[in-house]
């Protein structure tokens, strides 16, 4: 249960399109003249996330060793299941092709000069044209409609607040408490505060909407490189799900399954939260420096 949950957290930090609040982050960053592309996000996250894919299962294994450590019949069971499923259907092949096309276009969006939203609408249109999806399928995706509707409102509000100077004022107010400190220390403190502030939120989108822009503004005003501050706090918006059993949707679902007691969930989350922070406070900035992102 915990390995599955933390795999979800790591992939949410790894891919821009893996988590709904990530799209909010990209939009908020754009209001601050910081452009984050799909490929740029992935390039910045790939090394720290791959490292976490190795470290996190190891820590979980040491803290809670599995009851079953050998599965000699796993391959036979998998082969049998594949035979029962049969060959890929035409609709499944079309879905795979559209998925690959979408990822390629997202990766090349800067080169081709196209927006990520255009690619998303293109993919949906192709799936509708070829009958892979129906309008009924689209209407039933209430979560996606919520993001689509509220994202535009939130982006508009963020832009207006920025124009009115509220974000700048809030950034200066927070920065006054960190006055005189090196930008490295300021950014580290902001990341820790941003991470643990999620104990007060049950929604990552609400957290991002409330705190992301002001915290990035404070970091930049302290002298931190804009892209570095934007990306580290973006990653923090994904890994902060490792705080509680109500931190995001998957946490609530998996915690309610009953496989992990609430006390064990909080204990494991605290330990892994420290690991996430260490990796994204050390490995991520160094890697982004190597690839020239700041």
PLM ranges: what are they?
Residues 45-49, 86-97, 115-118, 139-155, ...:
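Helical membrane-embedded segments and adjacent short helical loop/helix-boundary regions
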Residues 58-65, 88-93, 101-141:
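Flexible hinge motifs at transmembrane-helix junctions and intramembrane kinks/re-entrant loops
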Residues 2-7, 12-24, 29-86, 235-294:
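Juxtamembrane and boundary regions of transmembrane helices in multi-pass small-molecule transporters
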Residues 50-59, 96, 100, 104, ...:
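Generic alpha-helical transmembrane segments of integral inner-membrane proteins
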Residues 11-21, 113-115, 159-167, 197-210, ...:
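Short helix-coil transition sites and intra-membrane helix breaks within transmembrane domains
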Residues 137-169, 182-200:
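Core transmembrane alpha-helical segments of multi-pass membrane transporters/permeases
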Residues 77-84, 146-161, 213-223, 277:
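Small-residue-rich segments of transmembrane alpha-helices in multi-pass membrane proteins
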Residues 180-222, 226-227, 233-234:
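Hydrophobic alpha-helical transmembrane segments of multi-pass integral membrane proteins
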């Amino acid at each position: 249960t915990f390995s599955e949950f933390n795999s979800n957290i790591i992939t949410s930090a790894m891919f821009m399109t893996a988590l709904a609040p990530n799209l909010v982050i990209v939009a908020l960053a754009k209001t601050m003249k910081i452009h984050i592309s799909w490929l740029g996000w992935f390039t910045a996250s790939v090394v720290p996330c791959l490292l976490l894919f190795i470290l996190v299962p190891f820590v979980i294994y040491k803290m809670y060793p599995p009851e079953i450590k050998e599965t000699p019949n796993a391959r036979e069971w998998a082969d049998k299941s594949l035979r029962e499923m049969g060959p890929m259907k035409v609709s499944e092949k079309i879905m795979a092709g559209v998925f690959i096309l979408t990822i390629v276009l997202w990766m090349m969006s800067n080169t081709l000069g196209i927006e990520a939203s255009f690619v998303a609408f293109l993919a949906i249109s192709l799936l509708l044209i070829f009958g892979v999806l129906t309008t009924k399928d689209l209407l039933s995706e209430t979560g996606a409609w919520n993001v689509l509707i509220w994202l535009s409102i939130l982006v508009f509000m963020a832009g207006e607040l920025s124009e009115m100077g509220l974000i700048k004022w809030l950034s200066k107010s927070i920065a006054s408490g960190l006055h005189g400190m090196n930008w490295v220390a300021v950014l580290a403190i902001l990341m820790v505060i941003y991470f643990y502030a999620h104990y007060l939120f049950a929604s990552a989108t609400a957290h991002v909407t409330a705190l992301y822009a002001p915290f990035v503004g404070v970091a930049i005003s302290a002298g931190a490189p804009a892209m570095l501050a934007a990306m580290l706090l973006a990653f923090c918006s994904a890994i902060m799900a490792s705080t509680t059993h109500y931190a995001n949707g998957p946490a609530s679902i998996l915690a309610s399954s009953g496989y992990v007691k609430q006390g064990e969930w909080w204990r494991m989350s605290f330990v892994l939260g420290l690991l996430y922070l260490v990796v994204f406070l050390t490995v991520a900035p160094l890697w982004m420096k190597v690839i020239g992102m700041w």
